[in-house]
């Protein structure tokens, strides 16, 4: 579903008039920003309220934050920004701390943009089908060798997370790095209008969120919205010279300044990332570091000091097996890259390879074909045992005329886990690849 755009001009907040509890006074965004400066911590989850914060009552498909505004104030929030105009009357005991606006989400987004403008610092936006978070982590560590850097925490990369990222930046920050995720056209454009980046990286264009983007060409258009923004605003992009798709996209925008770099920049830079495809992420970090004046020795140190977590490109040796975990997210492009890398991975004392592959989501009409393609790639790995998890892989497998040997289907992660506890494996090199959203 497309995200709502920001309003034209500055939003107005409705502040309850403390002199007369039945009337409201209009307060421009500047007044709300002054209140934010006095209470710079932002909360959106009433279950985890930071003391003296401002709570934004956001709405979702199955929740309404307005219902929890009074609870947030009880738990220590200084104020609550709400978009239910009846709240001051239904909770008069909290009325002096309720800020009524006509859209809490848009107010949050506009407040974040106001703060970004007040800070006036350079911001690098990172998007792409794969590798966003890894690239963000590498780049932030490299730039932190010279600057005070604030980068997106966790997965706060959407229409709520990006404003929260910006509002977490303090005046001592010298460089901001904002990860931008999207599953439909228009979403990157919205995030750019909030964060107003000066620099950008599109890591790659892959087959991710095909359903929301409407197909591969939609992915290209959607991710290209970062290039569009930077072309209009005089920004600069960092483009891997050996990626013909990204080079073509940059060339199509005549006013776009581009810093092109070869992936050979990653040569000789030691790191703890699994997979040859991570050379692109390392090269991007080196290119950005050099552009902003970080010396090569500090770049190598920063990249080498990064150890992935959250099951992203991790190799873990247990007492019985060696695990390659890449199961934060999965789409056809990242799945294919993992399989190509796993095929080349040496056994290093293990006796066989096992693939545990989980369903790829949000593929729409492309789901069956993409799952069949991944099964065929897995079958090309010699003597590998294939464990497929989820209904999409099961449907694709059953539709194959020629099915790979030594393949087992599991309806869920729980069933697979129970089977492995009952019949544990040992001396195996195991690739675990799938989306965290399927468990």
Segments the model singles out, each with a brief description of its role:
Residues 2, 9-110, 114, 376-394:
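N-terminal leader/targeting and accessory segments in enzymes
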Residues 52, 86-92, 201-322, 344-351, ...:
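Acidic, Mg2+-coordinating active-site environments of NTP-dependent enzymes
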Residues 58-63, 67, 309, 327-405:
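Active-site beta-alpha connecting loops in nucleotide-dependent enzymes
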Residues 99-103, 407-416:
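Short acidic-hydrophobic, aromatic-tinged amphipathic segments that line or gate anion-handling sites
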Residues 106-237, 241, 247-253, 289, ...:
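Phosphate-binding loop of NTP-binding sites
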Residues 127, 420-439:
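A glycine-rich beta-strand to alpha-helix segment
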Residues 175, 199, 284, 425-433:
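Short SAM/SAH-binding signature in class I
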């Amino acid at each position: 579903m497309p995200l709502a755009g920001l309003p034209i001009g500055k939003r107005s907040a409705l502040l309850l008039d403390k002199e007369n509890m039945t009337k409201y006074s209009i307060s421009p965004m500047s007044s709300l920003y002054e209140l934010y400066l006095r209470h710079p911590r932002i909360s959106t989850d009433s279950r985890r309220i930071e003391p003296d914060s401002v709570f934004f009552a956001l709405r979702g498909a199955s929740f309404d934050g307005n219902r929890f505004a009074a609870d947030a104030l009880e738990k220590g929030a200084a104020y609550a920004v709400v978009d239910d105009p009846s709240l001051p009357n239904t909770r008069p005991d909290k009325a002096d701390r309720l800020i009524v606006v006509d859209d809490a989400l848009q107010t949050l987004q506009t407040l974040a943009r106001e703060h970004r403008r007040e800070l006036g610092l350079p911001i690098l936006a990172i998007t792409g089908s794969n590798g966003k978070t890894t690239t963000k982590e590498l780049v932030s560590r490299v730039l932190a060798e010279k600057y005070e850097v604030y980068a997106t925490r966790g997965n706060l990369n959407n229409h709520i997370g990006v404003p929260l990222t910006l509002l977490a930046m303090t005046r001592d920050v010298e460089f901001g790095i904002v990860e931008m995720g999207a599953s439909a056209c228009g979403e990157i454009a919205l995030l750019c209008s909030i964060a107003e980046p000066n620099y950008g990286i599109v890591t790659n264009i892959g087959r991710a969120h095909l359903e929301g983007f409407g197909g591969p060409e939609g992915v290209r258009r959607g991710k290209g919205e970062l290039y569009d923004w930077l072309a209009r605003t005089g920004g600069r992009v960092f483009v891997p010279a050996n990626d013909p798709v990204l080079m073509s996209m940059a060339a199509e925008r005549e006013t776009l300044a581009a810093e092109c770099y070869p992936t050979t920049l990653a040569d000789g830079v030691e790191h703890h990332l699994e997979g040859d495809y991570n050379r692109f992420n390392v090269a991007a970090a080196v290119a950005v570091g050099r552009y902003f004046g970080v010396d090569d020795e500090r770049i190598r140190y920063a990249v080498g000091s990064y150890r992935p977590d959250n099951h992203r490109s991790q190799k873990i040796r247990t007492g019985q097996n060696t695990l390659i975990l890449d199961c934060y997210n999965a789409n056809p492009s990242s799945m294919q890259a993992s399989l190509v890398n796993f095929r080349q991975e040496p056994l290093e004392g293990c006796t066989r390879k096992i693939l545990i592959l989980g369903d790829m989501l949000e593929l729409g009409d492309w789901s069956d074909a993409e799952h069949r393609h991944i099964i065929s790639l897995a079958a090309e790995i010699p003597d590998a045992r294939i464990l497929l998890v989820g209904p999409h892989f099961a449907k694709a497998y059953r539709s194959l005329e020629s099915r790979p040997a030594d393949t087992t289907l599991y309806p869920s992660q729980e069933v697979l886990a129970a089977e492995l506890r009952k019949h544990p494996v040992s001396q195996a090199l195991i690739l675990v690849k799938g989306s965290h959203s399927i468990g």
